[in-house]
């Protein structure tokens, strides 16, 4: 569960390393975001010569959370950390590579590009 002020790792090669959630999109008083939800983030740590710079405000989709996601069969998939993939204005990933596993829930959320780039889909 991601909320305002949550720090996330970036799971792509856009140039950002750490981002902070500044808003959960999808409702005026929505408090938490889970896997597949879109959030507004600010870049807190970036590598030199990357596509994004420190301080930029971006849109991102949550791909991994410590809280995890519950499946219909009752199983829960949890991860060691929280991670997001940065998006452009057309809701497409900025990076060309995705690092680490992602869940099948992203397939329903119109993020097939992220699922196809990911090395492992759980």
UniProtKB/Swiss-Prot annotation:
Q: Does the keyword Transmembrane apply?
A: no
GO terms, biological process: translation
Give the matching SMART domains.
Ribosomal_L14
* Keyword check for RNA-binding: yes
Q: What GO molecular functions are on record for this protein? A: large ribosomal subunit rRNA binding; structural constituent of ribosome
What GO CC terms are in its UniProt record? cytosolic large ribosomal subunit
Q: Which domain of life is it from?
A: Bacteria
**Do you know which Pfam families this protein is assigned to?**
Ribosomal_L14 (PF00238)
Q: Which UniProt keywords apply?
A: Ribonucleoprotein, Ribosomal protein, RNA-binding, rRNA-binding
Q: InterPro entries, from UniProt? A: Ribosomal_uL14, Ribosomal_uL14_bac-type, Ribosomal_uL14_CS, Ribosomal_uL14_sf
* Function field: Binds to 23S rRNA. Forms part of two intersubunit bridges in the 70S ribosome.
Family the entry assigns: Belongs to the universal ribosomal protein uL14 family.
Q: How does it assemble?
A: Part of the 50S ribosomal subunit. Forms a cluster with proteins L3 and L19. In the 70S ribosome, L14 and L19 interact and together make contacts with the 16S rRNA in bridges B5 and B8.
Q: What is this protein called?
A: Large ribosomal subunit protein uL14
Q: Which organism is it from?
A: Pseudomonas fluorescens (strain ATCC BAA-477 / NRRL B-23932 / Pf-5)
